[in-house]
Amino acid sequence: MAEQGAGEADAGGGEPPPAAVMTAAAEALAGQRSLPTPFLTKTYQLVEDPAVDDVISWNEDGSTFVVWRPAEFARDLLPKYFKHNNFSSFVRQLNTYGFRKIVPDRWEFANDCFRRGEKRLLCDIHRRKVVAAAAAAPPPPSPGMATAAAAVASGAVTVAAAPIPMALPVTRAGSPAHSSEEQVLSSNSGSGEEHRQASGSGSAPGGGGGGSASGGDMGEENERLRRENARLTRELGHMKKLCNNILLLMSKYAATQHVEGSAGISSIANCSGESSEAVPPPPPLPPAILDLMPSCPALATAAAAAGLAIDGEPDPSARLFGVSIGLKRTRDDAAAAADEDGGGEDQAEHGGADVKPEAADPHPAGGGGGSSTEASPESHPWPIYRPTPMYHAVRPTCNGPDRAGSDQDGSSSSQTMGPGEFDDLQKMMVVQQSNFVMHWGRSECGSGVRGFGW
């Protein structure tokens, strides 16, 4: 009996009393529940701040909060409160605390314990990953915990009943919706979010596969992003191909216009005299340069020849180095001009001097008192130069160097010629002119050179 009493005393002294163990655990849990996490506290302060209501604020009834401007929220507020500017990281944090996205077209989040004017409920919001890990791998019961459980079952200790409600947020945390921060990046994010919501609702009630469900969600998200990246790559390649096709079409059209514009010039001749097939077509010139200033004389001559061939009518005017110099003046025209002048024929009729007929004239002029300037019906191939004679009164020469224009007696009277002497002088001048013209015409005809019609 003494040995049994000593053993009981040793056993009682070796293990702490069950009431003390449960009291310490309850105090620790109560201390944890008394203060919310810094993330929840800062988020609540952001939503409550009226100065940033245009960026983030409560909804009408205060049950949810809305991020109206995600870009400004990430740029201005996140670095101030959370030391980063990643909006996706903020959304993932909300997801771990059980927040759910209400509508797909707006960043509106809700939680049963996150309401306007009820800040005390923030203590009931816990991280979902910690609870899931504790539920997935429960520790083996120790002898002390078994004794505490027996004491609770017997009703001896009532303080230990306080920590039991801590499992209630697990049901609220396992909400059937997950927040998706990648919805702003792709139009297919709605279906991915629904898929993740279905997977989350299926795994939350069990509680045992929380860690594996989170890993599966990350894998599915990576796969979705990979598919999205591949799709964008294909679209980019398609757009590049379209741009290349448009550029090729425009270059072909420009080349066609270039060939059509320069085909008429390049097919005739080139400035160096080489074949146009061996030389690439010249670049097109502006219309003003093409019309007013040809690139070379060869092209100008060829273009003129082509224009004559197209018209089909020969140019009656004579040309000197490709330039028209007017119609050739025939003997008929020369005779008509002489008739209009009337000077030469009248003087020839008075004198009756004969002009030697030309060899090519089939009807020579008659001698005697006939006119020597009668036009033959057949025109000669060379022009006749008939200048209009100019007559001046003949004054006698001076008698001496000191008596210029004065008579013997010192008078300044001039001595004029008689009518017969003046007529003889005119006849002599006409004969000399006719001989000069005939001699010049024969010499020019013998050398094969035609006149210019002057």
From Swiss-Prot:
Q: Which UniProt keywords apply?
A: Coiled coil, DNA-binding, Nucleus, Phosphoprotein, Stress response, Transcription, Transcription regulation
Tell me where it resides.
Nucleus
Query: PTMs?
Result: Exhibits temperature-dependent phosphorylation.
InterPro entries hit by this protein: HSF_DNA-bd, WH-like_DNA-bd_sf, WH_DNA-bd_sf
Q: Which spans does this entry mark as compositional bias, Basic and acidic residues?
A: 347-361
- One cellular component term from this protein's GO annotations in UniProt: nucleus
Tell me which Gene Ontology terms the entry assigns under biological process: regulation of transcription by RNA polymerase II
Which SUPFAM superfamilies is this protein grouped with? Winged helix' DNA-binding domain
Keyword Metal-binding present in the record's keywords: the answer is no
Q: Where does motif Nuclear localization signal map?
A: 328-331
**Record's Pfam families?**
HSF_DNA-bind (PF00447)
Q: Where is this region: Disordered?
A: 172-222, 333-421
- Gene Ontology MF term list: DNA-binding transcription factor activity; sequence-specific DNA binding
> Residue ranges under compositional bias (Polar residues)?
182-191
Could you list the residue ranges forming a coiled coil in this record? 216-246
Quaternary state and partners of this protein?
Homotrimer.
Q: What is known of its domains?
A: The hydrophobic-rich region (HR-A/B) corresponds to the oligomerization domain.
Which family does the similarity line name?
Belongs to the HSF family. Class B subfamily.
Q: Which PANTHER family match?
A: HEAT SHOCK TRANSCRIPTION FACTOR, HEAT STRESS TRANSCRIPTION FACTOR B-2B
Q: What does this protein do?
A: Transcriptional regulator that specifically binds DNA of heat shock promoter elements (HSE).
Write the protein's name.
Heat stress transcription factor B-2c
Organism listed in the record: Oryza sativa subsp. japonica
